[in-house]
């Protein structure tokens, strides 16, 4: 194995020991979340009636650009007035009413002035599919922005035939300082709910024969790394002797991806009942899923492999593998012998095996009361002329379930976290994405159109405060 990777993993493992003893976040109570009101910010809704908004970027034209997952629309918004224009609508985007598919990734070329490219990923019909339950594919595509006509043209499919389902699409796309595309693709919801008996592929990588045949089914549960033309970088890691688009493996639903000023890649990832993760992405790293959720600590999670169950009529007890129906093979995290495991920088949240996953406060929507917060993206705050005091080296992580945005402080090298995740902006909203203005004193936040969120009293509501909105939070300097 690469000596550089070994050194990084050793460092992260040492950090994990510190994290477990000092920085392992304890789940907050609803009353604690209710206090996260952030009085030092003025709130203003500048745009509403969006249809499943997903990605949010500050454009090279100093305007806000955002996407609608349901419609395939790419919108440009004036950050002051909220006036909006539809720049383009990606044709033939597939979005199921009950699915996480649609228009997903969105990024500008770093040198947009000389290379006016916009990169997207999305769900499209797969003409080669013979599976009625899985008829779609994910495509990573490049468009050229035409300034004269103010629209997108000349589509080029960089990578087609990627896995797609209704669940765990992830779909965050960023371009790194190395001029490579980084893309998160989830495990497609395998081993749970509608896909309970489908084998999870997060630990699998392609053979050379599969890669040559453009069979990408093992790309589920990965972070991919592509050249800007979609080809495989020569310096990508080798897995079982094969160099593919895969950069890291062992992911569940990594919906957040962001580079730091010093070139490190941070990621937020949704866990099962417990252990949402904040990760530092390391070349060739294995992040454990589905064998490990969070730390390799045998705490609150075990891998129940329903695809190996003989009886395909049994039900998931929704106990995070700690309790399962008879006949389901279960392995503890400590029993997993996978190589190159990279522990998270932080979890939200880790609990013991005795934790009650059936809190009656949430009624039938018990998943809302689970320790997880459902992190939906990640944004590295870079400050500016009006930077918020004390926010240096900060990662912002929106939550879908808790109606907050977490502020996570990291050390100056972005290698470890300093303190607990601090919740802010509590409301009955499902926060989807967040960015800051170039000056650093204004945050812009997208909210989901629909869904469930936990109220201040701990119960569940689907009546959202600002559904499908772009909200402006302006810092009031003391």
From Swiss-Prot:
Region named PQQ: 252-253, 430-432
Known EC number: 1.1.5.2
Keywords on record: Calcium, Metal-binding, Oxidoreductase, PQQ, Signal
Binding site for D-glucose: 100, 167, 192, 252
Primary enzyme class: oxidoreductase
Record-listed pyrroloquinoline quinone binding positions: 367, 372, 401
Subunit structure: Homodimer.
The protein's role, per its UniProt record: Oxidizes glucose to gluconolactone.
The family this protein is said to belong to: Belongs to the PQQ oxidoreductase GdhB family.
Name of the protein described by the UniProt record: Quinoprotein glucose dehydrogenase B
Organism: Acinetobacter calcoaceticus
């Amino acid at each position: 194995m690469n000596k550089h990777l070994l050194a990084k993993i050793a460092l992260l493992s040492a950090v994990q020991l510190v994290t477990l003893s000092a920085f392992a976040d304890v789940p907050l109570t609803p009353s604690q979340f209710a206090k996260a009101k952030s009085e030092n910010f003025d709130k203003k809704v500048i745009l509403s009636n969006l249809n499943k908004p997903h990605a949010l970027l500050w454009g090279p034209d100093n305007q806000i650009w955002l996407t609608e997952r349901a419609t395939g629309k790419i919108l440009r918004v004036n950050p002051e007035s909220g006036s909006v224009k539809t720049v383009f609508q990606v044709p033939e985007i597939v979005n199921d009413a009950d699915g996480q598919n649609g228009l997903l990734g969105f990024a500008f070329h770093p040198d947009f002035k000389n290379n006016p490219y916009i990169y997207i990923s999305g769900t499209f019909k797969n003409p080669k599919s013979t599976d009625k339950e899985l008829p779609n594919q994910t495509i990573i595509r490049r468009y050229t922005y035409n300034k004269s006509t103010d629209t997108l043209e000349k589509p080029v499919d960089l990578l087609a035939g990627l896995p797609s389902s209704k669940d765990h699409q992830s779909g965050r796309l960023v371009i790194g300082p190395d001029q490579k595309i980084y893309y998160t693709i989830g495990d497609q919801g395998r081993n749970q709910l509608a896909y309970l008996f489908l084998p999870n592929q997060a630990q699998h990588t392609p053979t050379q024969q599969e890669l040559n045949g453009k069979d990408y089914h093992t790309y589920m549960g990965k972070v991919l790394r592509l050249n800007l033309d979609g080809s495989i970088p020569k310096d990508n890691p080798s897995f079982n002797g094969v160099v593919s688009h895969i950069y890291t493996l062992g992911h569940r639903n990594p919906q957040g991806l962001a580079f730091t000023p010093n070139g490190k890649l941070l990621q937020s990832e949704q866990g099962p009942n417990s252990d949402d993760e904040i990760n530092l992405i390391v070349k060739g790293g294995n992040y454990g899923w589905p064998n490990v959720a969070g730390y390799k600590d045998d705490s609150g999670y075990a891998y129940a492999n329903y695809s190996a169950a003989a009886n395909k009529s049994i039900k998931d007890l929704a106990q995070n593998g700690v309790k399962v129906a008879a006949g389901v093979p279960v392995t503890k995290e400590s029993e997993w012998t996978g190589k190159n495991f990279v522990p998270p920088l932080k979890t939200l949240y880790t609990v013991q095996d005795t934790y009650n996953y059936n809190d009656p406060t949430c009624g039938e929507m018990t998943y809302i009361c689970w320790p997880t917060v459902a992190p939906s993206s990640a944004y590295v705050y870079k400050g500016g002329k009006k930077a918020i005091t004390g926010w240096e080296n900060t990662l912002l992580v929106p939550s879908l379930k808790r109606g907050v945005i977490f502020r996570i402080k990291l050390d100056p090298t972005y290698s470890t976290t300093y303190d607990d995740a601090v919740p802010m902006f509590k409301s009955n909203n499902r926060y989807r994405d967040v960015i800051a203005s170039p000056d650093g004193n204004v945050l812009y936040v997208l909210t989901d159109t629909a869904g469930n969120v936990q109220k201040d009293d701990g119960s569940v509501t689907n009546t959202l405060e600002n559904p499908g909105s772009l909200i402006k939070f302006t810092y009031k300097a003391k």
